[in-house]
């Protein structure tokens, strides 16, 4: 989500939209960075004890962000007057509270981008999450009804929210995750360097990948099970895991317990400008997500010419399902997902032809400049309504 926010913020800055982005950030980054003339990124995170969480990474991380972000709003309201507050929702409680409270503090309306909605696609991630799910769902409904506008990543979620909110919310627009089609596919030299760096086969054995946050909702357990099924079938391959997350140690332990350590390569976090080389290097991207609002990684992979084998959940039905529908497996069906990967490896030509045919649609629908234009139109619509 943070990659998408930064990409969209930069595109909006090019269109002349002045922005102050308040984000939890990553350790080691500067507290304030002027990214461009119209874009300032501020890390807002109150001090908190380093207690590990298998959901957020650190216990209290979201609360620490909210407290610091609201404090920053108070500081900014006089020296940097804003027209609108934009909040990005991830299905968790604290971001839902940010919009209404910040809007009151600053005295301007707020709009929200729904990256993950409990009303539409979200699936609880733990016992505690299941217990609090009805409460957080109610808070989401409350926050969305009070927003001056809403953007969703898909028509699917927009339709659900329109039905849920009714006349209380009339400004709902679709602004999908954005990619840069011109940079989606890496040059052969970049791919070769990446393969050499991580000890991947230069030729011959296929590379299957998992790219993203290593957390429950991304379905990493299903990825390990699918790899086990492929290994049992005698397939020769390397499985590349790109990314980090609160459950990385759990995934590594599960891989070792399954006797698959020699099949896996973990890269840890990689900068976003290295992802095109990753996607181009893969023969198949595996996305066994439990829930997925859109699935920007799938779009990036397909634009790089890489097939995506995924569960048919959320927005993956609208991306993978439109371009290569035969690569969607029923949610939770690991054996079917493994068979899908095997089919692509055995006979990639039909799927690659579908990807070539679908590239123009992907570039038009998810290109960053197109998405930024939609976002700007949404802001103008919201402010026109408010004024």
Curated annotation (Swiss-Prot):
The keyword Kinase does not apply. Its EC number is 2.4.1.284, 2.4.1.283. Transmembrane segments: none annotated. The keyword Transport does not apply. One of its GO terms (biological process) is kanamycin biosynthetic process. Pathway: Antibiotic biosynthesis; kanamycin biosynthesis. One of its GO terms (molecular function) is 2-deoxystreptamine glucosyltransferase activity. Signal peptide: none annotated. InterPro entries: Glyco_trans_1, Glyco_trans_4-like_N, Glycosyltransferase_grp1. SUPFAM superfamilies: UDP-Glycosyltransferase/glycogen phosphorylase (SSF53756). Keywords: Antibiotic biosynthesis, Glycosyltransferase, Transferase. It catalyses: 2-deoxystreptamine + UDP-N-acetyl-alpha-D-glucosamine = 2'-N-acetylparomamine + UDP + H(+); 2-deoxystreptamine + UDP-alpha-D-glucose = 2'-deamino-2'-hydroxyparomamine + UDP + H(+). It comes from the Bacteria. Belongs to the glycosyltransferase group 1 family. Glycosyltransferase involved in the biosynthesis of kanamycin by mediating conversion of 2-deoxystreptamine (2-DOS) to 2'-N-acetylparomamine using UDP-alpha-D-glucose as sugar donor. Can also accept UDP-alpha-D-glucosamine, but with a much lower activity compared to UDP-alpha-D-glucose. This is 2-deoxystreptamine glucosyltransferase. It comes from Streptomyces kanamyceticus.
């Amino acid at each position: 989500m943070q990659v998408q926010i930064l990409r969209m913020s930069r595109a909006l800055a090019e269109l002349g939209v002045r922005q102050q982005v308040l984000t939890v950030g990553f350790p080691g980054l500067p507290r304030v960075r002027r990214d461009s003339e119209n874009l300032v990124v501020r890390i807002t995170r109150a001090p908190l004890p380093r207690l590990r969480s298998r959901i957020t990474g650190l216990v209290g991380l979201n609360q620490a962000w909210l407290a610091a972000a609201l404090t920053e709003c108070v500081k900014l309201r006089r020296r940097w007057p804003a027209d609108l507050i934009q909040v990005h929702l991830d299905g968790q409680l604290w971001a839902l509270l940010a919009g209404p409270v910040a809007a009151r503090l600053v005295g301007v309306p707020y709009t929200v981008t729904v990256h993950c909605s409990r009303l539409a696609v979200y699936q609880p991630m733990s016992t505690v999450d299941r217990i609090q799910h009805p409460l957080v769902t109610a808070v989401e409904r409350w926050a969305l009804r009070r927003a001056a506008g809403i953007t969703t990543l898909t028509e699917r979620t927009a339709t659900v929210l329109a039905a849920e909110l009714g006349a209380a919310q009339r400004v709902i627009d679709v602004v999908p995750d954005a990619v840069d089609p011109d940079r989606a596919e890496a040059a052969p030299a970049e791919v070769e360097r990446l393969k050499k760096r991580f000890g991947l086969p230069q030729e011959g054995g296929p590379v299957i990948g998992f790219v993203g946050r290593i957390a429950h909702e991304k379905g990493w357990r299903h990825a390990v099970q699918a790899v086990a099924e492929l290994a049992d079938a005698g397939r020769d391959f390397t499985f590349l895991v790109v990314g980090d997350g609160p459950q990385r140690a759990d995934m590594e332990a599960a891989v070792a317990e399954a006797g698959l350590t020699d099949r896996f390569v973990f890269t840890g976090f990689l900068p976003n400008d290295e992802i095109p080389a990753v996607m181009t290097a893969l023969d198949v991207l595996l996305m066994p997500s439990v829930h997925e609002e859109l699935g920007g990684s799938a779009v990036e992979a397909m634009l790089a010419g890489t097939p995506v084998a995924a569960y048919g959940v959320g927005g993956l039905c609208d991306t993978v399902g439109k371009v290569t529908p035969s690569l969607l497996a029923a949610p939770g069906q690991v054996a079917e997902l493994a068979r899908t990967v095997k089919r692509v490896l055995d006979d990639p030509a039909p799927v690659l032809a579908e990807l070539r045919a679908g590239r123009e649609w992907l570039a038009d629908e998810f290109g960053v400049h197109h998405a930024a234009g939609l976002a700007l139109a949404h802001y103008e619509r919201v402010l026109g309504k408010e004024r």
